[in-house]
């Protein structure tokens, strides 16, 4: 599964110097005019805007005036957009210190800080992000704002996942679980459920990377117990994908198919490219469940049937459903890059081949009372040993009734007891009819 869970495309956070600065205006006319004049400069002349905003900060800071807070927030944003990261961190640290001013409401300061965190998280400079998150979390520990702390820690956790820094990630997990515990009343019940699901989705990504299937199963079961939540669809996509993989490991193909379908719909709703990967898994589970329904018949999946990244799976399922072994093997060979490069799919390819061979084998032996294994092997284009293995599996699963003569390499069909009984009754009836004529 993908480790990138930044949600840039899924959440429309406006960072274009939002107009929420206008909701705390006090009658400082000269400062107010200077502030709006500075804002008018930032698009065409950001350097001049910076100088002007700094003058406001120096003029109003001693009075703990909200205009100083507003100006410093604009300075922080401009520095970030100009990629002046050191200057941005300096102004940001200063801004964090202003959040305790009595003139700044808790909701306004929280909204302002989180808006900066949200946008800065899109930065690709990992060295800057490490410093930025460190500055933010240290400051928030002193602000006693657990709601904001939780939202920020989610961003930090996503960043640590992309860096595969699992040691720090696990430390953050403990912090976030404490914040989301039932004993903590700072988070509303509905929000707690939503945050829990997001936290589980992050954990699932980490434990998927390190292939801890036991922990993944526990997380999946825990996520299903969360009832009061309105999660982002991508979060549900991750959780349902995990569920599908868990069912696949236990050979529960139909359940896996259901979970992959739900995962696909969630990723699709979120506009995530992960929908393509999970759609391949859905097709895989569909074949292994030996379903007669084409997975591309549904209105949700049909638009992707001819997608260049899906066409290999489209051809594969079509060949599979008409039991064309030769075509299945040819498609697997031709589209190795699209199919076998996925580690998850690759581990089930042998099961696909076994499944289709078994289905064809069942049809092949039906006309016979006994048949040479060599004949079956020739018709399927495989070795006698593969035929033996397939027949043994079918006998164990009670899909065919017969026995294998390993010495003479012959498979003999055994009639079910009720069939033998019915045949005997029919034969006796014929004898009686003949005798009484």
From Swiss-Prot:
Main localization of the protein described in the UniProt heading: cytoplasm
- Pfam families tied to this protein: PCI
Would the keyword Cytoplasm be found if you checked this record's keyword annotation?
yes
Q: List the subcellular locations.
A: Cytoplasm; Nucleus
Which Cys-Cys disulfides exist here? none
Against SMART domains, the record matches this protein to:
PAM, PINT
ATP-binding found in the keyword field: no
| Oligomer status and interactors | Component of the COP9 signalosome (CSN) complex composed of at least csn1, csn2, csn4 and csn5 subunits.
Q: Explain the purpose of this protein.
A: Component of the COP9 signalosome (CSN) complex that acts as an regulator of the ubiquitin (Ubl) conjugation pathway by mediating the deneddylation of the cullin subunit of SCF-type E3 ubiquitin-protein ligase complexes. Required, indirectly, for activation of ribonucleotide reductase through the degradation of the protein spd1, thereby supplying deoxyribonucleotides for DNA replication and repair.
Output the PANTHER family linked to this UniProt entry: 26S PROTEASOME NON-ATPASE REGULATORY SUBUNIT 11/COP9 SIGNALOSOME COMPLEX SUBUNIT 2
Return the protein name.
Answer: COP9 signalosome complex subunit 2
